[in-house]
Amino acid sequence: MSHRYIPLTEKDKQEMLQTIGAKSIGELFGDVPSDILLNRDLNIAEGEAETTLLRRLNRIASKNITKETHTSFLGAGVYDHYAPSVVDAMISRSEFYTAYTPYQPEISQGELQAIFEFQTLICELTDMDVANSSMYDGMTSFAEACILAFSQTKKNKIVVSKGLHYQALQVLHTYAKTRKEFEVVEIDLDGTVTDLKKLEAAVDDETAAVAVQYPNFYGSIEDLEKIQSFIEDKKALFIVYANPLALGLLTPPGSFGADIVVGDTQPFGIPAQFGGPHCGYFATTKKLMRKVPGRLVGQTQDDEGNRGFVLTLQAREQHIRRDKATSNICSNQALNALASSIAMSALGKQGIYDIAVQNIEHANYAKQQFIKKGFEVLDGTSFNEFVVKFDKPIQQVNEELVKYNIIGGFDLGVVSDDFKNHMLIAVTELRTKDEIDTFVEKAGELND
């Protein structure tokens, strides 16, 4: 090239055309019909100096509404939580900052151990036997859990609560479209929790699995013990989609007999960054270990007796046994899993518990303030989210709240007409009393 930063000068183009035997760019694209070719230059501005360009891009970026510029009460799967500063410092180290899969244990012990620690932490939170190295996000983990259930039980029906995140259900239906024999039965809600009578009636001997969220999408805590009692006699698997931060306080799904626990570790060290990337986790019992999707890191000893880590049980993966593999997922979110591991380790067991308690306390305070303001707050024992009914469209309310530097809650009318004019509000440990009071006050004014 004539210049290291300016490729494709006229000289470069002529050399390339000569090499392939074309006289001009027009001749190169001669097979393309002329009526679909653009016969003018693209409407792109001339190049700018770096300082000018950065100034312009920063000006454009400043138009974004972020948690740095506004107070956020938006959750619905992505939350504004405290992330220890050590997280970014550690994951930025060059040893970790790579997308490379650690196939060669002799040069990857650091990354392999980090993944192993992530698996260990997830098992401790969920009270399960085995966890994989991570997945793309919680919704992918959930759909893969359902596929595992179909494969393990040889049954074709899965019963899912409508209390699951609506996008998780969408991903499941997308998976099911490619497997026409699979049947997905959705169970209605009773208020903001699963209708247990309808759930019990739907579970039969043809059911591969029953799946619920804990806490569910509407913020309420499902009765896992009772749900498990409907399942045990039917030889179906019990799948729980759980918020890992909530498990620092709530009884873990494994203690209720869950067979598969999945979710997203975004609450631990992963910022709410315009939709992603996230980090799914997948935990299960030892019985199902050989059907777990994705990577598994195991602990072993080298020939000198030293502790070491390797990718293990790879024969179950699609890059080894494509035709017999349970899953076609052959990757993970190692960097985000590392971020979550560092966050969990920095906080410690007590720190995670304390933050979980603060989420419940702050959310309950906000609930009471909305009730005092005359709002209808839907019943349900919650963690850090709850549902409030408004008299006006939520989109309209949220557009007005932005003027006060407040990001309002999620518009549940997007999910179901049954929740028209209902807002799903998230209140995490980062929300202060003053912020909550201001939010409730402005919401009340806008609702009049």
Swiss-Prot record:
Its EC number is 1.4.4.2. It is an enzyme of class 1 (oxidoreductase). Coiled coil: none annotated. Keywords: Oxidoreductase. It catalyses: N(6)-[(R)-lipoyl]-L-lysyl-[glycine-cleavage complex H protein] + glycine + H(+) = N(6)-[(R)-S(8)-aminomethyldihydrolipoyl]-L-lysyl-[glycine-cleavage complex H protein] + CO2. One of its GO terms (molecular function) is glycine dehydrogenase (decarboxylating) activity. InterPro entries: GcvPA, GDC-P_N, GDC_P, PyrdxlP-dep_Trfase, PyrdxlP-dep_Trfase_major, PyrdxlP-dep_Trfase_small. GO terms for biological process: glycine decarboxylation via glycine cleavage system; nucleoside metabolic process. Belongs to the GcvP family. N-terminal subunit subfamily. The glycine cleavage system catalyzes the degradation of glycine. The P protein binds the alpha-amino group of glycine through its pyridoxal phosphate cofactor; CO(2) is released and the remaining methylamine moiety is then transferred to the lipoamide cofactor of the H protein. The glycine cleavage system is composed of four proteins: P, T, L and H. In this organism, the P 'protein' is a heterodimer of two subunits. HAMAP family: GcvPA. This is Probable glycine dehydrogenase (decarboxylating) subunit 1. It comes from Staphylococcus aureus (strain JH9).
